[in-house]
UniProtKB/Swiss-Prot annotation:
Monomer. Keywords: Acetylation, Cell membrane, Cytoplasm, Disulfide bond, Endosome, Folate-binding, Glycoprotein, Membrane, Phosphoprotein, Symport, Transmembrane, Transmembrane helix, Transport. The modification Phosphoserine is found at S6. Belongs to the major facilitator superfamily. SLC46A family. PANTHER family: PROTON-COUPLED FOLATE TRANSPORTER, ZGC:174356. This is Proton-coupled folate transporter. It comes from Rattus norvegicus (Rat). It catalyses: folate(in) + H(+)(in) = folate(out) + H(+)(out); (6S)-5-methyl-5,6,7,8-tetrahydrofolate(in) + H(+)(in) = (6S)-5-methyl-5,6,7,8-tetrahydrofolate(out) + H(+)(out); methotrexate(in) + H(+)(in) = methotrexate(out) + H(+)(out); pemetrexed(in) + H(+)(in) = pemetrexed(out) + H(+)(out).
């Protein structure tokens, strides 16, 4: 049964034959995140303005009289409904993606990384098309949820990241893997910074539609690159059925089947650590735009663009910081330093009532993203070379669950705490980050130099 060729497997053989050159995976991640970040804040602002119009709120947020709007009940209802629709989008994506991203990730261990990259690219492309229809035709904002679910059905950005990180693990040595993981995350940051700066200015100049069209064009290029230019990193791809429980079993076996070369405790606890880090990261990201739109900050689209750019700069600064700190510190200590700066940034956000203080919080996050590549690299070294896709699909599942928890906690907590402390969700995030800090330290103490699985030393 496992040897039967699926239609997707046939497509995989055609793609293999049509590859133009063996390109790296980093451009895919760059283009995907550029398109996503270009759409993300714009989608939040579009939902805000649509709800404002429906409720009769004029939607203006003049910064000189911003403080006088704090008691406006209509404004609070706009904030609450916008937060809830953001939650619905994330829940829709999670419920569909929980099954598909794990299935496709483990499947890529056998058929190669390219088929998953192509499917995930098509999903992101489809989501952009739905968003354009909503904006151009003034469709109900509930269609954003449909677009998110359709994207998750084909793997979503989490599936693309799973294949990308697995691809890096396929070709990197144990020594270089942490930096290669950070380099991939830096592509996310550079793309996010550029998209944020462009999106804010473009919205002010020409409205919502054109940025979504640019995102669509970028995603078309990305899909073509994945199909015809990406260099396959799995050494011997095999045609394998997609719809089989074997792929999900391979993920479960990572955590429950004993093996002399790996520690199930380290796998589970490092997964918990990255779960908490991602929960706080995406939870804060979910409410930051809403936090900045509302009183007392009342940012316009230009400032929101600058803020979103500053939010993505740590991907690049963390890469540089990681490279420098690795010369004098072990990876574990680098991760702990990153968590410390992340906690400081969250605390500043919680009490930020003026624009300079918000940007101070963004500045303190300059090393906040060194933690995740360290954890990913440690996880990758705990499993065999043939289990990288299963591992990173499991991590993608953890990411999806973390994003759902983030949306559920932060988007529900934010409107509930508007009356006594708007910044309370950021304080909660700062407190949660002590959990991975403790876990990483304890795991290093239990086994200071875990090298459970040695890969061939590829360049």
């Amino acid at each position: 049964m496992e040897g039967r060729v699926s239609p997707v497997g046939s497509s995989h053989r055609l793609l293999t034959a049509a590859v133009l050159f063996r390109g790296p995976v980093e451009p895919l991640v760059f283009l995907a995140n550029f398109a996503l970040v270009l759409q993300g804040p714009l989608t939040t602002q579009y939902i805000w303005h649509r709800i404002s119009t429906e409720l009769g709120y004029n939607g203006t947020r003049h910064r000189e009289n911003c403080g006088n709007q704090s008691a406006d009940p209509v404004l609070k209802e706009v904030e609450t409904l916008t937060s809830h629709w953001t939650l619905y989008m994330n829940v829709g994506g999670f419920l569909v993606g929980l099954f598909w991203s794990t299935l496709l990730g483990a499947w890529s261990d056998r058929v190669g990384r390219r088929p998953l990259l192509v499917l995930a690219s098509l999903g992101l492309l489809l989501q952009a098309v739905v968003s354009i229809f909503v904006v151009q035709l003034q469709l109900h904002i509930g269609f954003f949820v449909l677009g998110r679910a359709l994207c998750a059905l084909l793997g979503d950005f989490n599936g693309l990241l799973a294949a990308s990180f697995a691809s890096v693990a396929d070709v990197s040595s144990n020594h270089s893997r942490t930096f290669r993981m950070a380099l991939l995350e830096a592509c996310i940051g550079v793309a996010g910074t550029l998209a944020s700066l462009l999106g804010g200015h473009w919205l002010r100049a020409q409205g919502y539609a054109n940025p979504f069209w640019l995102a669509l064009a970028v995603l078309i290029v990305m899909t073509l690159y994945a199909a015809f230019c990406f260099g396959e990193t799995v050494k011997e791809p095999k045609s394998t059925r997609l719809f089989t429980l074997r792929h999900h079993r391979s993920i479960v076996q990572l955590y429950v089947v004993p093996a002399p070369e790996k520690s199930r405790m380290h796998l589970a606890l490092y997964s918990l650590a990255i779960f908490v880090v991602v929960t706080v990261h995406f939870g804060a990201q979910d409410i930051l735009t809403l936090y900045e739109l509302s009183t007392p900050l009342c940012w316009d689209s230009k400032l929101i663009g600058y803020g979103s750019a500053a939010q993505h700069l740590p991907y690049l600064t963390s890469l540089l910081g990681l490279r420098l700190l690795q010369f004098c510190l072990a990876d574990t200590w680098v991760a702990e330093i990153g968590l410390a700066f992340n906690i400081l940034g969250m605390v500043v956000f919680a009490f930020a009532t003026i624009t300079p203080l918000m940007f101070t919080g963004y500045g303190l996050l300059f090393l906040s993203l060194v933690t995740t590549p360290v954890i990913r690299a440690k996880l990758s070294k705990l499993v065999s070379e043939s289990e990288q896709g299963a591992l990173f699909s499991a991590v993608a599942c953890v990411n999806s669950l973390a994003m759902l928890m983030a949306s559920g906690i932060f988007n529900s907590l934010y409107p509930a705490t508007l009356n006594f402390m708007k910044g309370f969700p950021f304080l909660l995030g700062a407190g949660l980050l002590f959990i991975p800090a403790i876990l990483i330290g304890v795991l290093e103490k239990v086994n200071p130099h875990p090298e459970f699985q040695q890969f061939p030393q590829n360049s």
